[in-house]
UniProtKB/Swiss-Prot annotation:
PROSITE patterns: ZF_CCHC
Encoding gene, per UniProt annotation: ZCCHC2
Lineage of source species: Eukaryota, Metazoa, Chordata, Craniata, Vertebrata
A single GO molecular function term of this UniProt record: zinc ion binding
Name the record gives this protein: Zinc finger CCHC domain-containing protein 2
Organism of derivation: Homo sapiens (Human)
InterPro entries linked to this entry: PX_dom_sf, ZCCHC2, Znf_CCHC, Znf_CCHC_sf
């Protein structure tokens, strides 16, 4: 790390960083640490003044244990940080400070723990890159460390290493731990048994504590040149730049540092089991407490410190630059450095006191009713903090002061000042308010300043709201697991980036500005869901519009127009409920422009059907006026956990009980739906169970109210999480209601899993498209169509749980929508350029296009340039597959052309390639064939795109589409192969094996280009001849959290079992394997171009199996034809480059013999005497 900053040194030679001077003086090998480095629960002596010329306030030493780089005070404070405004030169200086702090100040244990915490914050691609860099750096010292690595990972017993007081024993244990493999559990178990018992270490410390004076003399003798060897043998002496005062007695500073390093490495090593690491972390905390404050603190596990967790294992550093519950902004963190541990903040607060409080200013944001007061607090340790308090907080604090801290004059002054703050905005006298408060705090007594109440009010981190960030590395891992289990989100790397910080925005009914509370998360996941309440007029406000941002808290935006829209919606609550329908429609038009975040639908108590309405069920989805990101690309990466919305309206419970009989009265119910999650949902449709609602229309023939004001719902147990909510139900086939045209509506694309029946969809005015599959379809025509994407066939388990019925009849409604007002460049055309009024029913297997860039659509525009998609989805007319039903009173308005796009698995493979247009015949609602229905199929090579209802682009690629014969298809043209292989937009392949009318499976058609099992894309690194519908797990096309279940049956192979390309495979046989669904959109797999190497072969590895069940494929047998990977092709020597053996078996001389690193073992002990029994190699 120091090597990285060397080019930056000559840039600013005259400005050495202020932090670097004193830590260098403190951390220089052999230096004596000052007494302020010792920190325990008792107040330490005051710190000594700085040695050099004064540069303003004493800059705080860097935080211990590597949990936060130092930030200079004064003018350079935060200059290189975001918002610091210091320019590039200031950023370079801050970078140099971090390098020097890391390399010169921290010891080995602190560096390792700090680096492990940083690695937990990296995403998978960054980790892979860092792994490559580490491999290159570690290769230089491989030959020197090879023997020690073999001993550490070998099967032989390393021998007796029980006496931790011997430097050679500690050295050998540290070397073994450093060279232990990450998966060698057996060797890790042996090392775990060899680690010193912490009780023995503590007992040794307690036994030698009474001989502290003699130990101190030995310490000083160990720092002399003559006593170096004696101190080395005794375990004393300087080490690692961290020298502690001799509180341990018998163990010197070097021995203490080595023991800390030993337990730190063991507690972080991945080869140890979880239980072992937790136990070792407890031992490490006990050891730190003993070295800090004596054995009596270690026996009670630091409980006198009252650190925010109940156990000492939770005693890890907080971020020293964190906002507290009152939005306190810490300019400097007044925490002295400790080389061994982190002192609790309670000890810090007891050790320092407030010397001066100054009111910096009074300000008001937006249309707030109250002021905010900013105070500058000077502490006794020369640190300065800036604390911002609201009027209510300041009023509560001042009125609750004890009598000994106030007087009659003080009380009168307080009341006068607070009355100014509570007046209306136009009646306030701001010039009078600020001087009163400034004089009040500047003339306060020492008893007032040193009071515990004043101290806790102005402290940097509140004891009430402080959630300890304990054990940074393990806490991050715990949070990752919890986020995966709660939300099953595919953005696992995003969840790790800002898991330390939750931004909770709390808006109140009175229009008070949002209070942003950045608090530390705790080890318990429930502590992060901090709820805040405010009482106004006796009514508890439960409106917690909180968005817990995991990745980008800065995207949590509350715009002014949404704020005003919320005020309008709230004002409509207090009006009379019996207002006309048209007036409510106007209110909805103003309030319906929602930009919500989607997550799972949390449904509560069971519902009771009363005619056409439902009563007393709360669909906990809440209002969406606060957005997290204005675009789908911003908000889809910010998942949120579902929350119970206990929102209360201003109505009484009796009024709510009476409000059960009319659908039109439900529009006044403020219990709106809350979405948290991914797309920008502006078009909202609701879902109801299909068996409990007789009709969705009211007496006027209209649909139900907008779902934002709709009645409540019950939990739908069999349905996976939807990204939109639809009014659903077993609607009678004769009830068909056309939807009104919105003002600026756009085409809607929806995911409808099979167990859901679509009966009616209501749109509201001023609504923008549903962000379901990314940008929705925009074709630029005057009338747009609604596409219901639903499948009567078994669909992949991404969309359907096991207990659902895959074949379900759907009722299809035709909607005409006005033209869009946005640019078609940012829209995805699901089935492009259809005639006006056309209606499409497609399977998710044929119409899903994953959007990797929701803002704009890269690559070829749609699947129309994809010959593979058209070969798998046949286009048939509805007059051949939908029987005419007599006696239907209500039908869909006659469309110009109606088509159904179904996978070829549901069609016959031997029908003539003809198209069947449906010229405006009535379509019965809810009649679609099931899986084994006898239907006709047409080839997608039909040259009549107008009559078949498909676009021009679909009909212009006949060479790439298979014919009606079940034989292999002709190879596509090179241009088409290139376009389909390189396009990311059409990576959803629906090539399936055909199924005839009797249900027998026809052999699948061979295709020239399709999804590859090696890389997941359509490439040339392997054949995909026997591609089948359910043989491949595609990435989730929707970025939201869906409940993923394993496949219905075991899956065959889709690619040969090696990276050899087509030229190296003789007969096309393949090795079956199971490819589980990866949690990321594109798994990190090997580069497919490696398949061009003749001797390269690698068996396809199983995917990410940490959170998903992995089932092995049956009949996994190796190829006997010789086309599979050769045995000698799996291993290669990186030393000589020849295949067939590993590097450790290589007979050639090393290629890097002349470039070996100069690193030598740091902890190698001195040469033992001749009569010593230790191995000379150690």
């Amino acid at each position: 790390m120091l090597r990285m900053k060397l080019p930056l040194k000559p840039t600013h030679p005259a400005e050495p960083p202020p932090e670097a001077e004193e830590p260098e003086a403190d951390a220089r090998p052999g230096a004596k640490a000052p007494s302020r480095r010792r920190r325990d629960c008792r107040p330490p002596p005051p710190p000594p003044p700085p040695a050099g010329p004064s540069r303003g306030p004493l800059p705080p030493p860097p935080p211990p244990r590597g949990l936060g780089p130092p930030v200079a005070g004064g003018a350079a404070a935060g200059a290189g940080m975001p918002g610091g405004g210091g320019g590039p030169s200031a950023a370079l200086r801050e970078q140099e400070r971090v390098y020097e702090w890391f390399g010169l100040v921290l010891g080995s244990a602190q560096r390792l723990e700090f680096m492990c915490g940083l690695l937990d914050l990296c995403n998978p691609l960054e980790l892979r890159f860092l792994g490559s860099c580490l491999e290159d750096l570690a290769r230089k010292d491989y030959h020197y460390l090879r023997d020690s690595e073999a001993k550490a990972n070998g099967l032989s017993d390393p021998g007796p290493l029980a006496d931790f007081r011997e430097p050679a024993v500690r050295s050998r244990l540290i070397v073994y731990l450093a060279l232990l493999g990450s998966e060698n559990r057996e060797a890790a178990g042996r090392l775990h048994r060899l680690l010193p018992q912490v009780d023995s270490v503590l007992k040794s410390l307690r036994a030698a504590r009474g001989e502290g004076s003699r130990g101190g003399a030995e310490d000083e003798r160990g720092e002399d040149g003559d006593g170096e060897q004696d101190a080395e043998k005794d375990g004393s002496g300087p080490e690692g730049g961290i020298v502690e005062p001799r509180v341990g007695g018998g163990l010197g500073s070097r021995a203490q540092e080595e023991l800390l390093l030993l337990f730190t490495m063991a507690s972080l090593h991945p080869a140890f089991s979880f239980h072992q690491r937790v136990t070792l972390r407890e031992h490490l905390e006990r050891l730190r407490a003993a070295l800090r404050g004596g054995p009596e603190d270690a026996e009670v596990e630091v409980e006198p410190c009252k650190f925010a967790g109940p156990r000492a294992q939770n005693n890890s550093a907080h971020g020293d630059y964190m906002q507290n519950n009152e939005s306190s902004l810490i300019e400097q963190a007044p925490i002295p450095q400790d080389g061994l541990t982190v002192a609790p903040h309670r000890a810090q607060r007891e050790a320092v006191h407030i010397e001066k409080i100054m009111l910096k200013g009074v300000q008001r944001k937006r249309a707030d009713k109250y002021w905010e007061y900013t105070f500058k607090v000077n502490w006794s340790d020369l640190s300065v903090t800036t604390v911002t308090k609201t009027h209510q907080e300041l009023q509560e604090f001042l009125l609750k002061l004890p009598k000994e801290l106030s007087s009659e004059t003080f009380d009168k002054t307080i009341l006068r000042a607070l009355n100014q703050g509570s007046l209306k905005r136009e009646e306030r006298r701001h010039p009078d308010l600020e001087p009163i408060l400034r004089q009040l705090f500047s003339s306060s007594s020492q008893a007032f300043l040193q009071s515990q109440k004043v101290h806790s009010f102005f402290q940097s981190i509140s004891s009430d709201s402080l959630h300890s960030i304990n054990n940074l590395q393990s806490s991050l891992k715990t949070s990752k697991i919890l986020e995966h289990l709660k939300e099953d989100s595919s953005e696992a790397s995003s969840q790790e980036e800002d898991v330390l910080q939750h931004a909770i925005i709390h808006k109140k009914h009175t229009g008070k500005s949002p209070i942003v509370n950045n608090i530390g998360t705790s080890c318990s996941p429930l502590d992060g869901l901090t709820m805040q309440y405010s009482e106004q007029n006796g009514i508890v406000d439960w409106r917690k519009q909180s968005c817990t941002t995991i990745q980008h808290p800065e995207h949590c935006v509350t715009s002014a127009d949404q704020h005003s829209a919320e005020k309008r919606s709230l004002s409509s609550i207090n009006k009379k409920k019996g207002k006309p329908q048209t007036e409510k429609e106007k209110i909805k038009k103003t309030d319906n422009r929602l930009n919500s975040r989607i997550n799972g639908i949390r449904l509560s108590t069971p519902q009771h059907a009363h005619g056409g309405t439902v009563k007393d069920v709360n669909l906990d989805i809440g209002s969406g006026h606060d957005t997290c990101g204005e675009t789908s690309s911003e908000s889809y990466s910010s998942p949120s956990s579902p929350r119970h919305d206990g929102r209360e309206s201003f109505e009484s419970e009796e009024e709510k009980d009476r409000d059960t009989d009319s659908n039109s009265e439900d529009s006044g119910n403020p219990s709106t739906t809350r979405f948290t999650g991914y797309g920008s949902v502006n078009q909202t449709v609701t879902v109801k169970p299909p068996v409990q609602i007789a009709s969705l229309g009211n007496e006027n023939g209209n649909l139900l109210e907008d779902p934002l004001n709709s009645p409540k719902y019950q939990h739908i147990s069999f349905m996976p999480t939807l990204h939109c909510v639809m009014h659903n139900g077993a609607q009678k086939s004769e009830v068909v209601v056309p939807a009104p045209k919105p003002a600026d509506g756009k085409t809607i694309g929806m995911l409808v899993p099979s167990p859901v029946a679509i009966s009616a969809i209501r749109e509201s005015a001023n609504s923008t498209p549903v962000g379901i599959l990314g940008p929705t379809a925009c074709t630029g025509e005057s009338e747009k169509h609604l596409e219901l994407l639903a499948s009567p066939l078994p669909i992949p388990s991404t969309f359907l749980p096991h207990s659902s019925t895959p074949a379900l009849h759907l009722t299809v409604q035709r909607l005409k929508l006005p033209p869009p007002q946005g640019s078609s460049e940012s829209c995805t055309v699901n089935i492009p350029q259809q005639p006006p009024g056309s209606l499409s029913i497609a399977s998710p297997n044929t119409a899903f296009i994953p959007i990797h860039n929701p803002g704009s659509f890269p690559g070829s525009p749609v699947a129309t340039t994809d010959p593979i998609t058209k070969s798998a989805s046949q286009v048939v007319g509805l007059n051949q597959m939908v029987p005419q039903i007599e006696g239907n009173t209500g039908t869909v308005p006659q469309p110009t052309n109606v088509k159904v796009v179904l996978p070829a698995a549901g069609l016959s493979a031997a029908q003539p390639p003809a198209s069947y247009p449906l010229p405006g015949s009535p379509l019965a609602a809810g009649v679609l064939p099931s899986q084994n229905s006898s239907v006709l199929s047409t080839a997608a090579t039909s040259p009549q795109p107008a009559s078949a209802g498909i676009s021009q682009a679909q009909a212009t690629v006949p060479p790439a589409v298979p014919t009606h014969t079940p034989g292999p298809a002709p190879s596509p043209s090179p241009a088409l192969t290139h376009s389909t292989a390189q396009s990311d937009s059409t990576s959803y392949i629906s090539a399936v094996g055909n199924t005839n009318a009797n249900g027998t499976v026809v052999p699948p058609q061979q295709m020239g280009s399709g999804p590859c099992g090696s890389c997941g894309r359509r490439c040339s690194c392997g054949t995909n001849g026997n591609l089948q519908l359910n043989s491949y797990y595609y990435p989730n096309p929707m970025p939201g959290p869906m409940y993923r279940v394993p496949s219905f049956f075991t899956l065959p192979s889709i690619c040969n079992g090696s990276y050899l390309n087509q030229a190296h495979q003789s007969n096309g046989n393949q090795l079956p394997f199971f490819l589980p669904q990866t949690p990321y959109a594109n798994g990190l797999v090997h580069d497919p171009v490696m398949g061009s190497q003749a001797n390269y072969g690698m068996q396809q590895m199983a995917g990410f199996g940490r959170f998903y069940p992995v089932y092995p494929a049956p009949n996994v047998v190796a190829n006997t034809s010789g086309s599979g990977p050769k045995k000698n092709g799996n291993v290669s020597c990186y030393n000589c480059g020849v295949s067939g053996h590993y590097a450790q078996d290589c007979k050639q001389s090393s290629m890097e013999a002349n470039q070996q690193g100069t690193y030598r073992l740091r902890y190698a002990p001195p040469l033992p005497p001749s009569n010593d029994t230790l191995d000379s190699a150690d």
